[in-house]
Amino acid sequence: MAEEFKATASICGGGGGAWWNSPRSVMSPSDHFLSPCFGAAITSNDFSSQENHLKSRMTCTDNNNIVFGQREADSDSGGSTVTMDSTLQMMGLGFSSNCSSDWNQTILQEDLNSSFIRSSQDQDHGQGFLSTTTSPYILNPACSSSPSTSSSSSLIRTFYDPEPSPYNFVSTTSGSINDPQLSWANKTNPHHQVAYGLINSFSNNANSRPFWNSSSTTNLNNTTPSNFVTTPQIISTRLEDKTKNLKTRAQSESLKRAKDNESAAKKPRVTTPSPLPTFKVRKENLRDQITSLQQLVSPFGKTDTASVLQEAIEYIKFLHDQVTVLSTPYMKQGASNQQQQQISGKSKSQDENENHELRGHGLCLVPISSTFPVANETTADFWTPTFGGNNFR
């Protein structure tokens, strides 16, 4: 184990140069997974001095080692495979590999030298997170001939998958992946091509912005202008609404003015309320009075106006005579003469009409002229009738 560690250390750090030149590894989230050879790199000047060591380790004879980096030749490229051993056994990982392949020095001279030189140039700028040789194209699981190799290669492939990292780890100068000299980059697995596209999207973003999804960009490009409302259309609709509002306001104002003019033309009636209360006077015609009298005397069977008036006059005279007869005993002045005349006249009439009585004529009314002397006399005289009072029943 010590000899193998020395051999790998001589391979990785033979000239003091840096092979992958990155403060962090892209392969895994932790820096403790990788072997110490990832902290150094083989430059173009030191690569020739390490050829003898590479020739001595052309095959993978130890089953405890795992093929870490491998490049398999396709039928079109015509190249040979490149393998590289890293003792992950020392790191505590029990991976095994049964594959054996050869190193082709010419491919390493052509492909790796260009990428190594550019990675060393990126070191001067202080941005070495994404490098050309640390891309997932080094790993190719096609060379594994045992289940242990395929499982280990799939496990390592998961470490190569890109994970979300802060913006300050993205390298803007790692453009050597797009170099046309690396023709083997286009002949890898589809899984590697997806990872390659993700790394390019991170590296080409100069402002360290998150990459956009291609489907979303195509959807934005395929949108038609009819889906969006332009500002001139909005302005035109607003102007139309304003004109309509102005028209309606003008119409309402014109209607209000017309109503005001009509109300001003009509003058209100000036009525001065009278201070005295108004009494309603009933107007009656002579004909209405006659008809009312006829209705009163109609039971008698006389509809003639003259006959009705004559009857009323006779009845009034009779009432007047009755009042005078009843009021004479209560009057002292001229009562004696009047009483004697009346008594003599009544005695004659009683003889003629024995059955004639004042009680049969109804209510007796007293005239106003006879009430004045009665009111001036003493009250005792009313209850002590004088001569002739005994004639009344």
Swiss-Prot record:
<dbReference type="GO" id="GO:0042631">
    <property type="term" value="P:cellular response to water deprivation"/>
</dbReference>
<keyword id="KW-0805">Transcription regulation</keyword>
<dbReference type="GO" id="GO:0071472">
    <property type="term" value="P:cellular response to salt stress"/>
</dbReference>
<dbReference type="GO" id="GO:0045893">
    <property type="term" value="P:positive regulation of DNA-templated transcription"/>
</dbReference>
<dbReference type="GO" id="GO:0000978">
    <property type="term" value="F:RNA polymerase II cis-regulatory region sequence-specific DNA binding"/>
</dbReference>
<dbReference type="Pfam" id="PF00010">
    <property type="entry name" value="HLH"/>
</dbReference>
<dbReference type="GO" id="GO:0043565">
    <property type="term" value="F:sequence-specific DNA binding"/>
</dbReference>
<dbReference type="InterPro" id="IPR045239">
    <property type="entry name" value="bHLH95_bHLH"/>
</dbReference>
<keyword id="KW-0238">DNA-binding</keyword>
<dbReference type="GO" id="GO:2000214">
    <property type="term" value="P:regulation of proline metabolic process"/>
</dbReference>
<dbReference type="GO" id="GO:2000377">
    <property type="term" value="P:regulation of reactive oxygen species metabolic process"/>
</dbReference>
<feature type="domain" description="bHLH">
    <location>
        <begin position="270"/>
        <end position="319"/>
    </location>
</feature>
<dbReference type="GO" id="GO:0005634">
    <property type="term" value="C:nucleus"/>
</dbReference>
<keyword id="KW-0804">Transcription</keyword>
<dbReference type="InterPro" id="IPR036638">
    <property type="entry name" value="HLH_DNA-bd_sf"/>
</dbReference>
<protein>
    <recommendedName>
        <fullName>Transcription factor bHLH112</fullName>
    </recommendedName>
</protein>
<dbReference type="GO" id="GO:0003700">
    <property type="term" value="F:DNA-binding transcription factor activity"/>
</dbReference>
<dbReference type="InterPro" id="IPR011598">
    <property type="entry name" value="bHLH_dom"/>
</dbReference>
<dbReference type="GO" id="GO:0071215">
    <property type="term" value="P:cellular response to abscisic acid stimulus"/>
</dbReference>
<comment type="subunit">
    <text>Homodimer.</text>
</comment>
<feature type="region of interest" description="Disordered">
    <location>
        <begin position="248"/>
        <end position="277"/>
    </location>
</feature>
<feature type="compositionally biased region" description="Low complexity">
    <location>
        <begin position="332"/>
        <end position="347"/>
    </location>
</feature>
<feature type="region of interest" description="Disordered">
    <location>
        <begin position="332"/>
        <end position="356"/>
    </location>
</feature>
<keyword id="KW-0539">Nucleus</keyword>
<dbReference type="InterPro" id="IPR045843">
    <property type="entry name" value="IND-like"/>
</dbReference>
<dbReference type="GO" id="GO:0046983">
    <property type="term" value="F:protein dimerization activity"/>
</dbReference>
<feature type="compositionally biased region" description="Basic and acidic residues">
    <location>
        <begin position="254"/>
        <end position="265"/>
    </location>
</feature>
